[in-house]
Amino acid sequence: MFSFIKWFSTLMENAKKKKGLWFTLLTIGSLMGIFASLYFVNFLVSDVAQKTYENQKNHYVLGFKNKIISQNEYTEALALALSKNEDIANDFFSSDENARKNIDKKSKEIENKINSVLGKKSLSISYEVGNNVKKGIGIDITKEGAVFKSSVPMIDKNGTITNVVVTKDIDTLIENYKKEDKAFAFLLTESSSHKIDRKLKKSAYTSYHDKFYIKSASYDKIFVDQLKSVDFGGILEENGFIKDSKYFYVYQKVYDLDGDFAGLAFVAEQVKDDNSFVNLVKNLVNSVTMVALGLIVSMLLFLF
């Protein structure tokens, strides 16, 4: 080690005596130091940026799951209230045909009141009869499309079972996310799309890469068109994020009440100005890189 230091010192002294060689070594050493330092800084900054995107993705996914819980609680509470309503139960299990009609009337009144508050027809109430019906709460695919569904049993004294079913269109999340300045879209898998009414599917849904279907009329056209550029073949994880020139997308796989893969939920933030999340990260990375480059050059010039 001592011999190497002595050799290096001698080499430097000889190089300083030869101006051309000295400046050549100085230039090469400086450039090597700059490139090595830049590579290291770029690696660290890129890693920080990636972790920032991951944290933002996790935040979006958590927000989506909380919205699902909130919607499920809403439909479940209404279904439970209806299942425990004595007037509805008496009418439903009555042999009087007028009593059964009265149920439909009451249910329709409740539907209309709630939908008038929501601003559109997104909630519906129905009844399923049978001894094998069971309670189920979550996202499901019906002939109307993807919905939040709560199916709660109502049993009479003779053991006859019916299910009070409350559904709410998943597209109600569009307005929720719009208030947060974000875009939302739900894409059905090709297999799940077979459960939708054929006329509705033909008139309202658009095929995406022959793998998914989207109710295009429900969503912002610019957002829907931009979604077509997403590589759906690369979506393998339960959730993840994708970036392009216009949006930062976060996706979450969604499963129906039978546990089957039903579709993909997308939440996206538009890259439209310097205050957008993606641009803030990009500007931060560029600023840190430039500052680091300035410090590295200054240190190298000082050392030599």
Residue ranges and their predicted role:
Residues K19-K105, E109-L123:
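Juxtamembrane extracytoplasmic/periplasmic/luminal helical "stalk" adjacent to the first N-terminal
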Residues I103-L118, K134-G138, I155-S207, F277-N283:
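Solvent-exposed, extracytoplasmic
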Residues S3-W7, E13-D47, N286-L303:
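Extreme N-terminal signal-anchor transmembrane helix of membrane signaling/transducer proteins, especially
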Residues V117, G130-K135, K215-G240:
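Soluble sensory domains of the PAS superfamily and closely related sensory modules
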